[in-house]
Amino acid sequence: MIDSGSREPAALTAVIPTFNNEAILGRTLESWRTYAGSMNVEILVVEDGCRDGTTALLEQSANMHWGRARLRWIHMDDAHELRCTNEGFRAASGTLVAAWQDDMFLQCEWLVTELIEVFERHRDVGLLGLSRGLDMFPIDDPIERWEDLLDWRRLRSTIGPFPWNWVRLQEVDSTIRPWVIRRECLERVGLLDEAFVPTEWDEADLAFRVRAAGWKVATCGYERLGGYYHVGSSTLGTLSDSYKARVLRNGRLFHERWDPEIRRTHARSRSTWARPMTFEGWANTGIQALRAVPRRLVERRG
């Protein structure tokens, strides 16, 4: 474990919980070294009682030139992702804090630069999702099954309306990992609620608390834009009944807390914000948008 006492505060801390995922974590760390190694970024890995070679990997990485300047890690014992994320938030030095996962690979330099600039330029944005946002709607049907949580009348995924979603951020109700939040927000509204351990709906609850405190929640499809790659996006398998039961419990807890707010605010107008793109960001966006044209034409014909 590495102390941060001699380091300047980071502009962004990426908090990465990990458990027995040595090879993939190594690629994640290498991606941050490659594309953000010269930036004022802190990587904080929370090692959750790993029994593979993760500890040795972290010790080796933290003693490299880049690691001494940018990498810290802390140990926990089978605490689960939510508690590990909170512990990382407590230890983070960054003005901005990212909830990252150990199978997400940074793929460019412009993404971190743009994320920092988003929060500099758009002071009303408190939390930014980097994949997809979620909008929620009031319906009277009870939540009895896991599938009820995903009813399209109740929950809709979005990256904003086409074609403007290539060049702007879209206000949403909530989002999914990865996301970036202002430290100021966490200090005001608190960390992830550990009532949601072990999994899911914790970040939705946080998003609604951020909104209740006066900030907005935004999203942009940065994975689609090539800013990062999430291995889990392509390897999701069949969910077990026990997993669905845990998610159902958490989803019910969320809706018990926030359904009145959903009913009150779902019809509000949604803000948008221009992406503060670098030249590289503009060029990459143009390339990705052109690549998407054939698929878009097929969808419209269908």
Language-model segments: residues:
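A conserved acidic beta->alpha catalytic loop
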Residues: 47-56, 105
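Short beta-strand-to-loop acidic/aromatic patch adjacent to the donor-nucleotide binding site
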Residues: 94-105
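Glycine-rich, basic loop-to-helix element that forms the pyrophosphate-binding segment
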Residues: 76-92
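Conserved donor NDP-sugar-binding/catalytic core segment of glycosyltransferases
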Residues: 108-149
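Active-site donor/metal-binding and catalytic loop motifs
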Residues: 133-135, 197, 219-241
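A recurrent flexible, glycine/aromatic-enriched loop bordering the glycosyltransferase active site
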Residues: 82-83, 159-184
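Short, acidic, metal-binding catalytic loop of nucleotide-sugar glycosyltransferases
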Residues: 30-40
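A short, conserved alpha-helix in the catalytic core of glycosyltransferases
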Residues: 112-114, 173-179, 184-190, 196-224
